[in-house]
Amino acid sequence: MSTKVYRAENAEIAAAYGIVSEYYEAAAVVVREDLDRFSKDYFADGAGVWLAEEDGEVVGCVALRKLSGSEGCGEIKRLYVRSKFRGRGIADQLVLALEEYAVAFGYKWLYLDTAADMKAAARFYEKKGFERCERYNENPQAVIFMRKTLR
């Protein structure tokens, strides 16, 4: 099967929000954006949602938004691949597409946070060149904070 990864357009907000909502449930996310906040945060200049699709089915996502109060910084959010599609490199493709956009947009750094029980996510990001850093937000679920310098 071939995976198609692309940046969602405004017409695809509902599909993007649908897969992100699956992520909310799978990761037991406490702080969630409603559809209006989601569209304002992620369907804006310097932001986006990338979707992974197989045979017309959306199977994964990752989001990018500007990190408020920090020049040249973006924040990765909502990386998720449906369980039956994991292990195929889809998360790698999603993050690569997001990083290519971030570099083209002019971001110098990408930040992310994750929960203590998401050790596999932290290892994944470390393999992608992210390093642990100080807390940069007030997310009550996050205990791991990471940053990557973009080239």
At which residue positions do the language-model features occur?
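Conserved glycine-rich acetyl-CoA-binding loop
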Residues: 57, 78-96, 103-105, 116-123, ...
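Acetyl-CoA-dependent GNAT
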Residues: 6-77, 82-83, 95-97, 101, ...
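Short linear functional motifs in flexible/disordered or boundary regions
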Residues: 28, 50-51, 88, 107-110, ...
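C-terminal "cap" of GNAT-fold acetyltransferases
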Residues: 9, 108-151
